[in-house]
Structures are given as C-alpha cells and as structure tokens.
Amino acid sequence: MVKAMPEDIKQEANKVVNVDFTGQEQWRNDLKLDGNGGIRKDSVVNIQLLLDNDPAFANVIAWDDFSEMLIKTKGVKGLPIRKGFWTDEDDAVVRSYMEHKHNLLFSKQNEQDAMVVVGKEHSINPVKDWIEAEKWDGTPRAERYFIDYLGAENNEYTRAVTRKWLAGAVKRVYQPGCKFELVPILEGKQGLGKSTAARNLFPKKFSDSLKSMGKTDEDYKKLQGNWIMELGELSAMKKTEIESAKSFISAQSDSYRGSYSHYVYPHLRKCVFIGSTNQQDYLKDATGERRFFPIRCGVTKPTKTVWRNEESVPKINHDIHQVLAEVKTWVDAGESVFADDKLMQLAKPYQQEAETVDPMKEAIEDFLNMKVPSNWEKLSLSLKASFFHTHIDHNGDVATWLQQHLDAGELQPLQQTTTREIMEVVFDKSVDRYLMGRTGSEAKRIKLIMDNMDGWDRERVRINGQRSRGYVRK
C-alpha cells in the first residue's frame, strides 16, 4: 500500500527533491517514503516516478523490442546523453543528475532497474516502423529487387529466391523464431554494390561483422539488434566449419545472456542471412546446398542506383518502403517461406556451378557414368578396378580389355554400387586397410557424396551374392 506524504513535511520534501508538486498530486502521492516521512533512496519506483515526470527526460527513454535493448530516442538538453543505445556512461550521468537536481543518490542497480521499467513502458519496434512507414501503392517491385539494383539475371529463379528471402525477412519481424533457412548468395565482381543492396533494406539494422558462424558465443550476441546479417566469404570457410555453420543458419533461437539480464534464456531469431562473393566456386558441402541460393549479379544493366547520396537517399528509401510494404502483404496473406521442390530444381544448376572442384566427387561420377559388362555383379573387386582404370586411361575404350579378360556381351549402365566397391575400385583402398580404420574418413566422404548424388537412391543391394547397404540408380 502506498503511503501518502504527510502534510507537515510537504514543504521540506519540496526543498529536498527540488520538485514543484503543484498540480501533480497523483504522482507525488505515489512516492515511497521511509519511516521518517522522507523519500526513500532504495526505491526503484521513486526513480521511475522522477524520470517519468521530469520534462528533461520526456519521451527520451524507450525499449527497442526488436533489439531487446534500452535506447534513447533523442538527446537530453544540458546533459551528455545522445540518441542511440543506452550505455554505462548514461547510467552514471543519470545518477549524477538525480543527486544534483533532487539531492538523492540512488544505487546503481536500482537506477538500472528503473531505466528498464521506464523503457518498457515506452516500447517501440524500429523494424516494424520501417516496414510500415508507407502503404503499398499496388505496383509490384519486390521480386525484382536484385534485378533492378544489381543487374541480376531476370528470370524465374532469381525472382523466386528474392521473393522467398524477403518474405522470410519480414515474417521473422512479426513472427520471431519462425523456421527459415534460405540464404541468397549475391555473386558478381567487386563494385556492383552487392553488400550495399542488402544494407539498404534497413541500414540501421544491417551488420556485416559476423566473421564466423556459431564458433563462439560472440557470434550469437552479434545477432541481437540486427535484421539483415551479411555472411563472411564462404570460400574461406574450412570443411570442418561447415556443420556448425549449417546449424547456426538453421537455428530458430539462440541462448545467451542478453543486455540488462542476469539470466541465459532463448532469444527467438529475428534476423535473416545473406552472402556476397566475388568467387564463382565457393560451396564446399553438398548437404548445405539447400540453404545457399546463388544469384548472379551484373548480368544486366541496373535500372535503379544502389548508391546512397544526398539526392538518391529519398528515392531509395521510398522504394525500399514500397518493397517492404508489398512483401508484408504477402506475409499477411500467408506466404510460404520454404523452398519448395520447384525452387530446388531451379536452384540445382546454380548450386552445382558454385561448388568447389572436388576431385573425389569427379572420380566417383566417372565411375557411375561408366558402362559395364552385363555380368558386372559377379566380377571380383580387383577385376572391377582393372576395368575402371582401363576405362579412365583409354577414354572409355575397353574393347581390348574385354577380349583379354572376358566376353560379357554389350556394355550397359551401372545399376548399383556400395561405398566399399567405390572405395576399392575407384580409390584402391583395400578392405584390410578399411577395417584397420585408416580409410574411415574416405568412407565418410564417399557416403556424403553418394547420399547427395543426383539419380541415385540409398537402398540395400545384393552384390557378389551378399546383401549390404548401397545405392541404386533411379
């Protein structure tokens, strides 16, 4: 129960806190008092009331719902407090101000708690405000965003990837933590403005400071407060980092201790990722292909400038507002943000083109594309290896080999195989060495390649009279 200030100490209280109570009976009566009728200095509520009713701090302190951080919407006249995120220095300034103006020295913890309470009473979401800044005028623009600004290929694939990604970006603002893992990779020479095009979507909530993906706790904290996250150069990523990167991109929440928090708890994802590269081959892992969608830029002449200057900024901002307003109509109508089978088929040639050269995969493809004798399944592994290497060494001319070793009629496409067969026939890795554990890494690589090989399904097969796990041509 709030204890009202006794009438006989009003005059003295006015002198102590240096506040004019005239016409402000309600908030004055809410001040917490100590046993002697003085204003309590250990009260969070008292700090909150003083800040809420101080004209100098009117509409200054707010809570950024998107960043989950305390902010200053403007500066405070006469104090070294400037617009931006709240800092430790600002805490010190407020405590000093309270002591100078009101003769009240509050504890640092109570002052910080009060700041959060005041901020939460005035919550804002800058990204929602940015998206909703203008009403869509009905002119389609969004699907052509990278086409118009970066001269990207004007085709169904580019428009589909752009649509999915923008829809995912907007959906994460309104539905934090929604499942979304599509990452466009803007390909093209330096100077096109690839990073700038991503930044322009909302410069204040863009970051390119993420140098690794999930390797340290700092990676997760960098996501806080940013909407568009540009990835580092994918071609520089080691294969050992691929798995953690895939998990990092696919996560729907991140657990860490946020600002103004003593606790570790899950923070729902509000950001999306985009990459840019000057390389033509940068994808190193077939299992990551479904996340990365290359977009070739600089193919056509851009119809809009991506570069911001005094003249172009109003035009760019208006266009961005219209793009985002359009995308919001998609999301409001239930737009799917998942890459469907059609998009995956459209993406496949682009993803394959972006893959780094893998000699091991090329050798396996040579083996799978080779035509073999009709009695192939009955041949020993050593004889199969001899046939394969003859095929490679003589550019597919195996007639002489067949005459010398067997007469098996017309050659036909290979129909099934196993990891062991590939390991011994293609890479000369004997079973003895395999059982000794020396070729475990090769076996894993072969399995990974075959699991993602077009035209082949993983099934149980029978080879040389024995059943084992293998792969069958579709």
Q: Residue locations for each model-derived region?
A:
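P-loop NTPase catalytic core of nucleic-acid-dependent motor ATPases
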Residues: 118-224
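AAA+/SF3 P-loop NTPase mechanochemical coupling elements
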Residues: 219-224, 258-276
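Short glycine-/polar-rich loops that comprise or flank the Walker A/P-loop
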Residues: 225-227, 252, 269-272, 287-293
